[in-house]
Amino acid sequence: MSKRVQAKHKLDRRMGQNIWGRPKSPVNRREYGPGQHGQRRKGKMSDFGTQLRAKQKLKGYYGNITEKQFRRYYAEAIRLRGDSGENLIGLLERRLDAVVYRSKFVATPFAARQFVNHGHIKVNGRRVNIPSYQVKAGDVIEVKEASRQLEIVVVASQLAERDVPDYIEVDHQKMSARVTRIPGLSEVPYPVQMEPNLVIEFYSR
């Protein structure tokens, strides 16, 4: 088992939830945390613990974004007008690797980050290899023609169980996608409940 898969399993077990909705998640078999003390009954979690858990879950879902980068998203979310929690979700869903994942060009957020890093994606006709690149409404994302027959792409395009959300229009023949709008929390197809307002509270302490 690779270190990346082990890390995913560990996060699922720590949260007690199947964060990415994976069939092979260990919480499908058991619902306690990792390690020899994982089966101990846990007491009531403090407000701080609840907020920390919400942050770890959201941060982990997007491929374990670095703490420094996640703090920048928080700072931008509270600077923007409107609900800060909704703003945070919008910023995360605007990440190029998130759009690549949502468009079903690859199977996981981790694969999406690597796919972008390796230069397989264009935005508005120009190659972009920065996973955190912020996509705008109306931008067109496409898989480079030379990359369209890679096994990782072919397999992902056949995943019937994961629908493309309404805020992205995808042409799987051309392997291109267009972001029609920036989504709110209720529109994002998370496999588990995300609580961005608790994340905002965590950083606002």
UniProtKB/Swiss-Prot annotation:
Q: This protein's superkingdom?
A: Bacteria
Alphabetically ordered keywords of this record: Ribonucleoprotein, Ribosomal protein, RNA-binding, rRNA-binding
Q: Does the keyword Translocase apply?
A: no
InterPro entries linked to this entry: Ribosomal_uS4, Ribosomal_uS4_bac-type, Ribosomal_uS4_CS, Ribosomal_uS4_N, S4_RNA-bd, S4_RNA-bd_sf
Q: Which GO terms describe its cellular component?
A: small ribosomal subunit
Q: Name one GO molecular function term.
A: structural constituent of ribosome
Assembly, in brief, is: Part of the 30S ribosomal subunit. Contacts protein S5. The interaction surface between S4 and S5 is involved in control of translational fidelity.
Entry similarity comment: Belongs to the universal ribosomal protein uS4 family.
Q: What name does UniProt use for this protein?
A: Small ribosomal subunit protein uS4
The organism encoding this protein is Methylorubrum populi (strain ATCC BAA-705 / NCIMB 13946 / BJ001) (Methylobacterium populi)
